[in-house]
């Protein structure tokens, strides 16, 4: 504004000395100059975007250089945007392209965390899970081999038709492998049994991506100690602490869509039990080796007993022959049914029933330094709804409510009192007893050999596929 006022003052001074014509010309030229200056001012105030339209006069030379630099910068930015768009699959603006580029980096295969927390289904986004150990079936009694099954197109087609089922077992098995590896990294004397079970189950729920009855834990975590062989898990308030001289059987299960992995191992800290563990592991592997399509269950039991009893162990200066626990068995597994009807004995003299194509079995063996027979003992913690029970009228409201809770959360899978506590249930013991008395729910109390004895267990789940036998729960550990 100051420049415009100066020009106007100068014009009035000149008008006093010139004749009228000259005064008109002078006034015109002064007005033109003032207008030019106004235009320049306006163009400068508009900034770089308007500067591109300025006339190339001397005073605007600096502005033109600025505009040129701006244009160069914007051209470089456009080029970078184009490159980013190509990396980001070619759609969206530059910023979107950069974001997509970052997402592309994240698409790489996920790796398991420590401690494990990434669900198995996220580690294998293509939905194909690792196979277990594939074995050829044993030769038949007349000496014929089963090698033809691996090349038969018919058997391959049958195997492929059930691929979705096998894949569910494999996902559950991979979760089991990773959980038990994690457990072995921290389990130690001094921990309470409740602490051990809850830590194990929390990890299992994450890896299996628990989802109601579609995926989750197949049965409570067994952590039976010493002479107790099976079906012990702590109830609320149990203060039992794991000791250095304890021999602990960790038996837990996972499932996807009711396809159950039943797998167990024994944990010890004192090396004096090593031979006992070796005997039972060898017996379990013998049972797995003998199992197959058309194999008689009694033959598997006889082979297991022969291997188990070939071992002697020395514990605290006393020698024992390892005995198979004759009233504990392996078993067939059905969908949402841990015991599907057939039993695999671990001593001779069992049923002559044959294993069949497409069946799933838990091959488990128990060795003992005691009598080799177990009986019910201690407080019950395991329960399971009877698979074959029909409609039973229930009068008590609390019993009806508890049955609804069991149906919604466990169905026909086994459960324990801790899991009812976790769901917020309280004062349910009378209702639970009522369900047991009515035959709707079966109790499974701890099974123990004589006091002072030691028991060990190893177990795997096998699939009798049309082409081969798959030890689906096999791992690097056992």
From Swiss-Prot:
Tell me, which GO biological process terms does this entry list? protein processing; regulation of translational initiation
User: Where along this sequence does the record place binding of a divalent metal cation 2?
Assistant: 262, 331, 364, 459
Task: List residues modified as N-acetylalanine.
Answer: 2
Question: Which GO CC terms are listed, alphabetically?
Answer: cytoplasm; cytosol; plasma membrane
Q: Where is the composition biased (Basic and acidic residues)?
A: 55-79
Locate the Phosphoserine modifications and list their residues.
45, 60, 63, 74
Q: Signal peptide span per the entry? A: none
Quote the subcellular location field of this record.
Cytoplasm
Q: How does it assemble?
A: Interacts strongly with the eIF-2 gamma-subunit EIF2S3. Binds EIF2S1 at low magnesium concentrations.
Q: What name has this protein been given in UniProt?
A: Methionine aminopeptidase 2
The taxonomic lineage of its organism, from the top, reads: Eukaryota, Metazoa, Chordata, Craniata, Vertebrata
């Amino acid at each position: 504004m100051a420049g415009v006022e100066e020009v106007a003052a100068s014009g009035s001074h000149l008008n006093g000395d010139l004749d009228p014509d000259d005064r008109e010309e002078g006034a015109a030229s002064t007005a033109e100059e003032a207008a030019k200056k106004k235009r320049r001012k306006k163009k400068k105030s508009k900034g770089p975007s308007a500067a591109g339209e300025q006339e190339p006069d001397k005073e605007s030379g600096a502005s033109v250089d600025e505009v040129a630099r701006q244009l160069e910068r914007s051209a470089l930015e456009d080029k970078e945007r184009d490159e980013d768009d190509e990396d980001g699959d070619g759609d969206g603006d530059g910023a979107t392209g950069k974001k997509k580029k970052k997402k592309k980096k994240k698409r790489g295969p996920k790796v398991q965390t420590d401690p494990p927390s990434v669900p198995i289904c996220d580690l294998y986004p293509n939905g194909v899970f690792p196979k277990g150990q594939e074995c050829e079936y044993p030769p038949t009694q007349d000496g014929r081999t089963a090698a033809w099954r691996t090349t038969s197109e018919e058997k391959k087609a049958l195997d492929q038709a059930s691929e979705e089922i096998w894949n569910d077992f494999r996902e559950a098995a991979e979760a089991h492998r990773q959980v038990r590896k994690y457990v072995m990294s921290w389990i130690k004397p001094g921990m309470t049994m409740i602490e051990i079970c809850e830590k194990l189950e929390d990890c299992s729920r994450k890896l299996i991506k628990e989802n109601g009855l579609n995926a989750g834990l197949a049965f409570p975590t067994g952590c039976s100690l010493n002479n107790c062989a099976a079906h012990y898990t702590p109830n609320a308030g149990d203060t039992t602490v794991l000791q250095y001289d304890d021999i602990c059987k960790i038996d837990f299960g996972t499932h996807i869509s009711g396809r159950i992995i039943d797998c167990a191992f024994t944990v010890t800290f004192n090396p004096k039990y090593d031979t006992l563990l070796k005997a039972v592991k060898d017996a379990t592997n013998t049972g797995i080796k003998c199992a197959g399509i058309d194999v008689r269950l009694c033959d598997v039991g006889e082979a297991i007993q022969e291997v188990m009893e070939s071992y002697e162990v020395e514990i605290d200066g006393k020698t024992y022959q390892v005995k198979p626990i004759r009233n504990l068995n392996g078993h067939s597994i059905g969908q949402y049914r841990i015991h599907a009807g057939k039993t695999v004995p671990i001593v001779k003299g069992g049923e002559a029933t044959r294993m069949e194509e497409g069946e799933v079995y838990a091959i488990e063996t128990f060795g003992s330094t005691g009598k080799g027979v177990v009986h019910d003992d201690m407080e019950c913690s395991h329960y399971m709804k009877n698979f074959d029970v029909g409609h039973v009228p229930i009068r008590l409201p609390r019993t009806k409510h508890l049955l609804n809770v069991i149906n919604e959360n466990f169905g026909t899978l086994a459960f324990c009192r801790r899991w009812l506590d976790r769901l917020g249930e309280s004062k349910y013991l009378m209702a639970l007893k009522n369900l047991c008395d009515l035959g709707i729910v079966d109790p499974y109390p701890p099974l123990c050999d004589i006091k002072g004895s030691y028991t060990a267990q190893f177990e795997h789940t096998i699939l009798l596929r049309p082409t081969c036998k798959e030890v689906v729960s096999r791992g690097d550990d056992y």
